[in-house]
Amino acid sequence: MATHGDAPPIGRGRENPLLRSGLPIFFRIESANGLGLALPENRHGQSVRVWARSLTTMQKEAIVVSLGSGAAWRLASDEGPYLDGLDAAPCPLAFMTTGMVSSYMHEILALAEGRDITMRNLVLVQDNFYTMVGSALRGTMTGGALPVALDVRVDTDADDDALRGLVTEAVRASPVDGLLRPRHTSLFTLTANGDECRVGRVASLGR
């Protein structure tokens, strides 16, 4: 696996679609309907639909629409030289971290309001740790994730036990916690030119 020290200079002699487009890495879209993209069905109370495509080796572009707010955003991601990327946008796992801490913040504030606990200057500092061993080119790469560290800093009149209990319950109430705790069976579907390609090693989505 290449490291930062022995990787070639970023972008030398390679096309960089994200920079060439001249667009911001993230921006809000006025209307997803104008792009011919339909909102998802509301099956579980909070529905999000994502349309994504690959731009180059590691660059991805996505349009994300939330049924709850109707908001649509264009997002983009890239990787660094250690994965043969161009470092033109945040890596995909950065979006996971941002979504997690945002969800925790929302749940903490909602629970505090319900319990009439005043939160002043609430700050969450979250560290996510990921591992990567082996070579992507050789097909031996294995990725992993270590436990998340969440540090809560707040000025409040609540005692330590009440605050600790509130944060613990808020984290468990977060949708992302429901995604991370149980073991899931991977589902994957690969489609080329409208035809599904058999992948063999994992269960197909929808089956």
PLM ranges: what are they?
Residues 1-97, 110-207:
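Extended beta-strand/beta-hairpin segments
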